[in-house]
């Protein structure tokens, strides 16, 4: 009986631990759309990770950000009215530098790097990003993405496991809204993506479920399955289910605002 009670107590303790909420405002975030809030958000993520996991909560407001670095056992929740806005790089600050990859020559630059993104994680597990908020990649670009400090993707994940993206809206996402490479057990549910380059790039991934998503990407792939050599090893993409999704090629932003326009006269590689 004592052993059962001890196990029950440990279970409750673990549930309580992982239910801990870390409000980014308590870590110095201003949510005024001007202050760069990624350092405060990263402090909240680090505190949650140090405690074994928890929910990093972003209340309503505008969070100008450079790179947000994910950790294992973290749930990032964007409240209604929350906007994570990718800031334009400055002279002295910007996005994390793209990590070296000796296999660059086998696929383009965008598929070969993950850290030069608004939100990124490498070698992690048990990650959720959810909520009715918006990720707005305003300062992300495909052009000049090789330069230090430049960010070119909204969310990048490499060699991660047990990832859920749910209920988010994403606008103007640079080269990719999501680059998932070598991810096992990935769930993408009820996302609305309105961009003009790639929506979801599912690369060398296994056990993927994509459902109830709207992806507008007039100049590139909406949802694409592939197997590049970005990981430096051969790995198939397998066991993928895509259901109840809507993909389109309307002007960027016009699906989000409900106007559904087809007037944009720009070439695919310009206007970022």
Predicted regions and their residues:
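Extracellular/periplasmic carbohydrate-active domains that bind, remodel
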Residues: 8, 17-272
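Sec-dependent N-terminal signal peptides
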Residues: 4-13
